C-alpha cells in the first residue's frame, strides 16, 4: 500500500522520530522505499553560512542527515536523498505531488496555538495540500 514514501526532514529530533515511522511503513512492503527530502530555505541557508563560516555548509547539512541515513540503512530499506531549494512547505508539497508518493511522513515541532497562527506550521501546510496520505509525527 505505501511503497513509495517521502520523508520530509530537517535533521531535528522530530525528524528522527518521523524517520522511525517512515521505516515502519516502508518495512511493511516488499519493495518499500523512502525518499528523504531536505529543503534548503534561502533564509536559513544564509544563517547556516554565517554560523558555519569556517566550514562547508553542504558538509553541515549532510551531518544533520547522518543519523537518519544510518537508521534507514540499518533497516535495509532502499532510499534516496534529495536536497531542494526554497520555502519548505511549498517545496515539499510540490515535490510530493509531482512525484506521486504513496505517503508523506513529516515531523511536527509541536507549536502552540499562537505560534502556529503567527508562524504557520510546515507540517500542517503539507497535510492540507499534498494529494496523498500524510503522517505527522510528534
Report the location of each language-model feature:
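Conserved hydrophobic residues forming the short capping helix/wall of the S-adenosyl-L-methionine
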Residues: 26, 68-72, 96
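Gly/Ser-rich helix-loop-strand patches that form or flank binding pockets
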Residues: 95-138
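Phosphate- and divalent-cation-binding pockets in alpha/beta enzyme and binding domains
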Residues: 17, 91, 113
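Structural beta-alpha unit
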Residues: 73-104
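General small-molecule cofactor/ligand-binding pocket signal
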Residues: 35-37, 80-84, 135
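Small/aliphatic-rich secondary-structure junction motif
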Residues: 1-52, 75
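A short acidic, glycine-rich active-site loop
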Residues: 53-63
Amino acid at each position: 500500500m505505501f511503497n513509495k514514501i517521502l520523508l520530509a526532514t530537517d535533521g531535528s529530533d522530530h525528524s528522527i522520530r518521523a524517520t522511525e515511522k517512515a521505516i515502519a511503513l516502508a518495512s511493511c512492503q516488499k519493495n518499500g522505499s523512502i525518499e528523504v527530502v531536505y529543503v534548503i530555505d534561502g533564509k536559513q541557508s544564509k544563517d547556516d553560512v554565517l554560523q558555519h563560516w569556517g566550514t562547508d555548509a553542504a558538509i553541515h547539512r549532510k551531518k544533520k542527515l547522518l543519523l537518519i541515513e544510518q537508521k534507514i540503512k540499518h533497516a535495509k530499506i532502499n532510499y534516496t536523498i534529495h536536497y531542494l531549494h526554497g520555502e519548505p512547505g511549498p517545496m515539499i508539497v510540490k515535490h510530493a505531488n509531482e512525484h506521486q508518493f504513496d505517503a508523506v511522513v513529516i515531523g511536527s515541532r509541536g507549536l502552540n496555538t499562537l505560534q502556529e497562527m503567527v508562524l504557520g506550521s510546515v507540517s500542517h501546510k503539507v497535510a492540507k495540500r499534498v494529494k496523498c496520505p500524510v503522517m505527522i509525527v510528534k
